[in-house]
Amino acid sequence: MKTANSKITKGKYGFFLTVPRGEVRILQLTDIQIIDSDQMRTPDRLVEAERLKWTADKVWHNAYRYVKEAVDKAKPHLIVITGDNVYGEFDDSGDRFREFCEYFEGLGIPWAPVFGNHDNQTKCDVISQCEYMEGLKNCLFMHGNVTGNGNYAVTLVRPSSEPGENNGEGTHFSPLRTLLMLDSHGCLHHPGIRTDQIGLCREALKEVEEKTGTVPPLFACYHIPSYEFCLAAEDAGYQKADDFWAKYDIGVTVPAKNGDFGKRDDPQGKVGDNSAFMEFFKANGGDGIFVGHYHKNSTSILSGGVRYTFGLKTGLYDYHNDDMIGSTLITLKDPADATGAPEFTVKHLYTAFSPDDPA
């Protein structure tokens, strides 16, 4: 299967995405969280101002214009969407979910979504929604036979030579990076990455090694972070791990270290337990984790060789800070770059729109 100058190959535990030579751009979108107030289950669920601004005819203004802006800026090879894509409680018909999928399919760019804690709340059959995404041309999604909805790997590969360069043996492929796409739960189950999910990750990496000869560095993408983000912030000296109400703006109210950046304006505590996953992740070359869930947190902090990043919230649905809307660009450097540049960089792309701008 080919899409947007990329080739998608499906494996047992995930996908292999062939990307061109040069730097590779991954765009993270998170907490788009489309709300259709016309589908409120009870008349008092939203206040009147929310009901009026979140009707079905305003989805472009509240969400998709921000997605288009981000895609136009980043020109990504891959889009990852880290949960709370459509607020299921406000989409019992499934109409907004299908529109969401159709919009991203129409971009012609491979996109890899995970579930957040609100996606599962629809009265629609979630398994059918998973099957719907699995059948889409550009969507890299796999339900996975473990706890949750959507547990799989995406491995970025590129030709290590042009056809015919390898003594007539044809094109060889080398892996650049494997992304572990995981359901962090929080709706049907308590948050946290489970033992069986770690087992699936282990099998996925075996498949990567079998097909490419090695396991590349890892990213992890999921919705709800646990205590690992608090510990990273403490290690960097920005807060005490147990100070769940800490607020700061790195480089503004506290000095930045190691290229860190972003703002913490949402309380975050210990929800779930990802300690076993973190042990596995680090032992297998993991060095970047990308999450969402906390709409007013945008910190990106390096700790113990891993960069912990809250993606910038995309769009205007649900609570947010108007000056913290946009997307997050992850750039993998060209392996041919011998300048000593970091293996990857992370940058928030802030929107140029005002919430009051006309659609």
PLM segments and residue spans:
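N-terminal active-site segment of His-dependent metallophosphoesterases
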Residues: 1-95
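Binuclear metal-dependent phosphoesterase catalytic core
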Residues: 2-8, 12-16, 20, 153-158, ...
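Extended active-site neighborhood of metal-dependent phosphoesterases/phosphodiesterases
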Residues: 2-18, 96-216, 328-329
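Active-site-proximal beta-strand elements of phosphoester/diester hydrolases
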Residues: 23-36, 176-185, 221, 307-313
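Divalent metal-coordination and catalytic microenvironments
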Residues: 31, 67, 79, 84, ...
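Active-site environment of divalent metal-dependent phosphoester hydrolases
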Residues: 33-38, 87-90, 113-125, 187-189, ...
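Short aromatic-enriched loop/helix-cap "lid" or pocket-rim segments at secondary-structure transitions
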Residues: 38-42, 124-127, 230-235, 322, ...
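His/acidic metal-ligating clusters that form di-metal
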Residues: 74-77, 172-174, 178-180, 189-294, ...
